[in-house]
Swiss-Prot record:
KRAB domain sequence ranges: 4-80
Example of a GO biological process term: regulation of transcription by RNA polymerase II
One Pfam family from the record: KRAB
Organism: Homo sapiens
Covalent cross-link Glycyl lysine isopeptide (Lys-Gly) (interchain with G-Cter in SUMO2) as placed by the record, residue numbers: 99, 439
Gene3D superfamilies named in the record: 6.10.140.140, Classic Zinc Finger
InterPro entries to which the protein is assigned, alphabetical: KRAB (IPR001909), KRAB_dom_sf (IPR036051), Znf_C2H2_sf (IPR036236), Znf_C2H2_type (IPR013087)
Subcellular location: Nucleus
Gene giving rise to this polypeptide: ZNF627
GO molecular function: DNA-binding transcription factor activity, RNA polymerase II-specific; RNA polymerase II transcription regulatory region sequence-specific DNA binding; zinc ion binding
Function, in words: May be involved in transcriptional regulation.
Family: Belongs to the krueppel C2H2-type zinc-finger protein family.
Record-given protein name: Zinc finger protein 627
Zinc fingers typed C2H2-type, residue spans: 99-123, 167-189, 195-217, 223-245, 251-273, 279-301, 307-329, 335-357, 363-385, 391-413, 419-441
Keywords (A to Z) from UniProt: DNA-binding, Isopeptide bond, Metal-binding, Nucleus, Repeat, Transcription, Transcription regulation, Ubl conjugation, Zinc, Zinc-finger
Amino acid sequence: MDSVAFEDVAVNFTLEEWALLDPSQKNLYRDVMRETFRNLASVGKQWEDQNIEDPFKIPRRNISHIPERLCESKEGGQGEETFSQIPDGILNKKTPGVKPCESSVCGEVGMGPSSLNRHIRDHTGREPNEYQEYGKKSYTRNQCGRALSYHRSFPVRERTHPGGKPYDCKECGETFISLVSIRRHMLTHRGGVPYKCKVCGKAFDYPSLFRIHERSHTGEKPYECKQCGKAFSCSSYIRIHERTHTGDKPYECKQCGKAFSCSKYIRIHERTHTGEKPYECKQCGKAFRCASSVRSHERTHTGEKLFECKECGKALTCLASVRRHMIKHTGNGPYKCKVCGKAFDFPSSFRIHERTHTGEKPYDCKQCGKAFSCSSSFRKHERIHTGEKPYKCTKCGKAFSRSSYFRIHERTHTGEKPYECKQCGKAFSRSTYFRVHEKIHTGEKPYENPNPNASVVPVLS
C-alpha cells in the first residue's frame, strides 16, 4: 500500500487565499485540521520533516511514525529558528495524542507555532526565519541592516526605527517610507507585476487586490449589509459601513477627542490640527487636505461634470453635490431644520443654515468689518481686498475671483447655454438672464429700471 502524503489529507491555502477567509471560515478550517491531526495521531502517523517554509501551502511529505511533537524548533547556526508554519489554534493541549510546540530556549510548552515565533524572538531578540515569498530576503532595515524575509515582520521593526525611510531595497539600495512603496518597487526588479487588468491596464502584485479591482468593472458587490441592504465590493468597506448602524467609532483624535469610524477619516481630520494640505491644484495652486477635494476643485477649472441628476438632468461635479441636490427633490435628509423644514445631508451644512435663522455670523473681515455666516463666503469676500483671482481662463487669459464667475465666462467661448425656457425654448448662458426672460411669460414686473438702456447684469470679476 502506498505511503500517505500530508497533501492527501490536508486542505491547502495560499497566503492571499487565507487572508480572504472570514473568521467563521478560518474556524471551520481549524476544526477540520484539528480532526485530521487526531485521526493521524490515532493511526500512528507523523511528518518526517518539520522545516516547512510556506505557512499555508505545505509540500508533499511522507508520514511514517507516531509523533512525540508535531511542532519542533530547530536551532540554526546564528540563533535563527525554523518552524512548521501551521496557523495557531490547529494544535493545542486538547488535541489527543499531540504535544504542542516547545521552546528550545526555556522549555515552555503549550504554544501554537506563531506564538512560539514571538516567544523565541522575546528571548533572543532575533526574527525567526519566516515565510520566503521570492526565495531570498529582499527587504532590509537601513537603520540596522537587518534582513527581513516576510512583510509581517516589518511592523515590529517599524517601532524600533521611528522616522526617516526605514525600508531599504537590497537590489539597488533605494529607500522607502512604507512597506507598500517598497513592495511596488520590488516589482521593477521582478520584471513587472503578475496581475494586470485587461480592461484598464492597472497592475497588482496580489491576486486578492486584483479580484477586488475587477469588481469595479463588473459591478459585482458580494458583501451586503443585513441592516439596510446596501452592497459593497470589498469586505473592509462593509465593516466600515456597519459602523454607521452600530455607532462604533474606534479612531479617536488625540488633539480634540473627536472620533471616527474609519482610519482614513481620522488621518484627514488630523490635518486640520497640523495645517497639512498635501494635495495642490496645478491650475491655481490652492491646497487641500484630501485627494477627493482637490479632484472636485479641479473640475471648476476644466468644467467637467461627471454626475447627472436623474430627476432633472442637472450636471454636477462631485458626488457630494449630487447628494445635496437630490434633497431638493426628495425633501429627505438626516439633518432637518426645525424652523423651516429644510433638510441637509451633512451636519456642517445644517449648522451653516441654522445661522440664517439665528443671525449668527462668526467670520469677521478685518479689513472692512463685514461679517459672514460661513467660512467659504468669507474667503470669497477677502479676495475683494487682496485682489486675488485664482481662476484663469486658458482661452483668453482673463482671471476671476470666484469659480462661479469663471464657469459663466467659459460659456462665452464654448457657447453653452444650460438654462432653457420651457415656454418658448430660448436658451441662456446665465441663470440671471433666464430668470429675467421668464418674467416676459408670467407678466411679472418686480422692479422698474429707470434707465432701460443701462445693463442690470453685474460685471463678473
